[in-house]
Amino acid sequence: MFKGEGPERKVSGLLFYINNMNIKQFVVNPFGVNCFVLSNDAGDAILIDPSVSNEREEEALTRYIEQNHLTVRHLLNTHLHLDHVLGNAFVARKYGVQLEAHEEDAFLLDLQEEQSQMFGLPMREPSPGLGNTLAEGDAVEVPGIRLQVIHVAGHSPGGIAFYCENPGEVNGQKNVPPLLFPGDILFAGSRGRSDLFGGDDHALVSGIKRKLLPLPDDTVVFPGHGPTTTIGDEKRWY
């Protein structure tokens, strides 16, 4: 959870292209969640935290998927705080996919109404339950894209990061940096809050130091809120 800029925030749409992988970023809902659409050249797509919260955001996401002839294969959540799950029901119903997240965050799905009242964040439709649980060492794959699951508790008990160790070539160059999608575990110059529903700052800092900071310095980090950063840049804060 991270402070947003209000309900009139525009749906932005940054696009990155790395060999066989397209990365489309939308900023959605009043809390400014970064939603990512990863796809290969064959049109297989992975959605990370697609927390669209109104018709305008749903239409922007749908339009991108349809215009690029994508087939959604996976619906992933880095964690299950309300601001990251607002679009789960829409995506699951429209594209026929199941929610995939860590089982230690499953209890948060029973607290959606409580979270909605706490943060004043309207919930159009509750998220469905977990369809597939992800744990440390698992991998989520479509041809040409492999995301390794890294479990880092502390922001939430079941917080996970998705690590792409080998994104492939760019313009024939093989030295392409790894990619990390840590949700609210790690931000540019900061980390996630730990005062919500089972949070633990000691566990969060420990997990970041043990599991994320040892990654290559040039790893590009796409956080759950805010701008991109690198692991090398974040090491100075720890």
Locations of regions flagged by a protein language model:
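Positively charged N-terminal leader segments that act as targeting/secretion signals
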Residues: M1-L15
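Conserved S/T- and glycine-rich ATP-binding loop of Class I adenylate-forming
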Residues: L38, T78, V152
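Metallo-beta-lactamase
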Residues: A45, V52-S53, Q115-Q117, A139, ...
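Short Gly/Pro-enriched turn/cap motifs at secondary-structure boundaries
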Residues: F26-V28, G129-G131, H151-H155
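Short acidic-hydrophobic surface loop/beta-edge motif
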Residues: F16, F26, L38, G137-V142
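Active-site HxH/HxHxD metal-binding segment of metal-dependent hydrolases
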Residues: S53-E58, T62-E141, I145, N166-V170, ...
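Conserved beta-strand hairpin/beta-sheet module of binuclear metal-dependent hydrolase folds
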Residues: M21-N68, A161-G168, G172-K174, P178-F181
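Hydrophobic/aromatic beta-strand patches that form the interior of the parallel beta-sheet core
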Residues: K24, L76, E100, N132-L134, ...
